[in-house]
Amino acid sequence: MKRAQSLSVVKRNQMLLEQIKEIKTDHPLWGYRRIWSYLKYRQGIAVNKKRIYRIMKEQNLIVTQLVRLKARRGPMHPKPHADHPNHFWGIDMTKIKLASWGWLYLTVVLDWHTKEIIGHSLSLRSKTDDWLDALHMAVNNRFPNGIQSDMKEQLFLISDNGCQPTSQRFMMNCSLLGIKQIFTTWSNPKCNSDTERVMRTIKEDIIWCYDWDHPFNFEVAINKWINDYNNDFPHQALNNMTPTQFYEHFLSKNNQPVLT
């Protein structure tokens, strides 16, 4: 027979449940591992991962994994591995449906090593200029003294074969900046998987869960989300540090000034 929980355990679980529900309000598709990581490493709450799982399961808050049919493709090549910041960046775009405006396009640049979103742009179009705006933001963030003087090793930019990253102007800009482009193929979609995973997180957290009716409202929301993602979301792949913490840790470990 299952032993009844003590009053202190019941109170503790109730407190944790309220905190879990608060997180799930903003991030309804977060699983128990990510919620546990956020509670422990960002809010400083000492709690066992199994306890979070048990509470969420009892309250039907566990995210159900959908079974998806996968297209058959040719042999997969291993995806690139970023050994340090500014080694591999990824760039990708997604679109947001606005009730009375049509489509809004979000372009994002991600540093694969730190998982940090270092550049982004929003536009009612989907033009090469928008991709260049996101890329130039990333360059200015990471190379404030100029990319030619600050870049120590070759920087690669991974993208799909869309008309924007393959346009003559975009490719010429990358060449002038000293950035080498890598293009994914249909048979090797994992080549830009880190960037696509972040785009999926954006969709889960802020696009699919809300009905957006004005570009300004979404702009405010995405700017806040990116700031929270970079500075407040711990990543298991980063030893439960945030992207900003991980980047600053790398700089301090290698005796490089922390950018502010």
Regions found by a protein language model. Name each.
Residues 102, 120-148:
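Active-site beta-loop-alpha junctions of metal-dependent nucleic acid enzymes
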Residues 147-166, 241-244:
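Acidic/histidine-rich, metal-coordinating catalytic segments
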Residues 65-70, 156-161, 175-194, 211-214:
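RNase H-like polynucleotidyl transferase catalytic core
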Residues 88-118, 124-126:
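An active-site-proximal beta-strand-loop segment
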Residues 6, 175-179, 201-260:
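C-terminal domain-tail junction helix/linker
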